[in-house]
Regions:
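Cyclophilin-like peptidyl-prolyl cis-trans isomerases
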Residues: 1-163
Length: 163
């Protein structure tokens, strides 16, 4: 991979998740994430779905799993005819979607544990390089019957970091 895009998620509690994104593997997905981050779309949004031992999901402006940015992007994964060799291991960031392969918009998830059964079905586009303990803290909060944290897990900002 020649190109790497660096990003940071700053949490309300001061926790920082550093990511590297791979535009050579998932160019549409990375471009979309960068566009949303640069427009401050994610600022103030929550991780609305948290399942310890699986993943933490955020990026919905509605905070319940139904919202997006007003557009959808092509799903960059094998079942949709796109080669993507990023495996859904602990710390990998990927796009959430509905049953429609091309329905991803702004919602993303970070794998709390290896979830390789998702490989080829979801557009992985990067990984956590620092702050996996912050992912662990989010994954370990108490949740309701919809897997929504009882205490909000709010992102203050998502920023693209120039190298």
């Amino acid at each position: 991979m020649n190109n790497i895009v660096n990003a940071e998620i700053l949490m309300e509690n001061g926790g920082l998740i550093k990511l590297e994104l791979y535009p050579d593997i998932a160019p549409i997905t990375v471009e979309n994430f960068v566009k949303l981050a640069n427009s401050k779309f994610y600022d103030g949004l929550i991780f609305h779905r948290v399942i310890s031992g699986f993943m933490i999901q955020g990026g919905d402006p509605n905070g319940v799993g139904t919202g997006g940015p007003g557009w959808q992007i092509k799903g960059e994964f094998a079942l949709n005819g796109v080669e993507n060799n990023i495996s859904h291991k602990r710390g990998v960031i990927s796009m959430a979607r509905s049953m429609n392969y091309n329905s991803a918009g702004s919602q993303f998830f970070i794998c709390h544990a290896d979830s390789t059964f998702l490989d080829g079905q979801y557009a992985a586009f990067g990984k956590v390089t620092e702050g996996i303990e912050v992912v662990d803290e989010i994954a370990d909060v108490a949740t309701n019957f919809n897997d929504k944290p009882i205490t909000e897990q709010k992102m203050i900002s998502v920023r693209i970091i120039a190298e």
